[in-house]
Amino acid sequence: MKKIVYTGGIYGDEFVKYIFDRKIRVESLKTIWERMSHLPVQHDGFKEYINVADEKMRVFDSKNEAFVRCKQIIRSPMEANPWYQITFDDDSTIIVTGKTRFPVKGKSLSRYEKKYIDELFAGEVLVGVDYGAAADSKDKFKNVSNEEDDIEYIITDLFEKKIVRVTKIDKASNESFQLVTDTGLFDVSGTLILDAKMR
């Protein structure tokens, strides 16, 4: 099962809790990239990524309450501003690029809408969304259709986070980062998010 993903990037100073070289570390995404930059850097258009699956790197995933295998670290050095900070009702925040799209609850509980960050407003609820669920999981998932993509999506119990505030902020960096994990989830600065697109 794959995840509907955030298509934007995460600010390099956001932190991740992870295990590497037998140590639990809490470091920024930029520091993790620099730590792993001794490995070959691959290119995919303007994005760069490092395959870390063989490095025994594990990233914390609060949904599964475990450190899960990290497969890739992705850097987009040409990712342009603006940056936005989202504040949630549990006081957690995350800084992401304006290209980020989020699944949010629609008018019907069985539907969701995908919105770019500059279309979000206070009171909307971010939801976890999967696609391609197995037939034997029907009791756990609720089918919805989304005419925009002509794909059947399902809302899950991954998470719901109410947005309190979306703030456009000025950041000096023009690079963003993403991770790919085995579970498709990881925590950034205390916020559980869906990972980058699987390659």
What kind of feature is each model-predicted range?
Residues 1-199:
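Autoprocessing domains of the Hint superfamily
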